[in-house]
């Protein structure tokens, strides 16, 4: 799996970086969200606990997937802005048992 960052936007109003990237996974299935998030965080020297992987889109017959991630300056900012289902999906919060 190889990740190529195509664009990084600085969103100062929301206190985050918006990262667009391509994942080249020739001869392999689409990589897991955890694997992509870990490699992207290591590549860009970011904290994976303040990073949300919004989507990975794979296209039929292609060995390239496109993705979008958001890296926040602080965890508090991320928890305030991002919807709960996104945080649950990325494993950044745990669902409360009733």
UniProtKB/Swiss-Prot annotation:
Keywords: Ribonucleoprotein, Ribosomal protein
GO cellular component terms listed in the entry, alphabetical order: ribonucleoprotein complex; ribosome
Molecular function terms from GO: structural constituent of ribosome
Lineage top rank: taxon: Archaea
Pfam family, one: Ribosomal_S24e
Record-linked SUPFAM superfamilies: Ribosomal proteins S24e, L23 and L15e (SSF54189)
GO biological processes: translation
PANTHER family: 40S RIBOSOMAL PROTEIN S24 (PTHR10496)
Family membership: Belongs to the eukaryotic ribosomal protein eS24 family.
UniProt-recorded name of the protein: Small ribosomal subunit protein eS24
Organism: Thermococcus gammatolerans (strain DSM 15229 / JCM 11827 / EJ3)
Annotated gene: rps24e
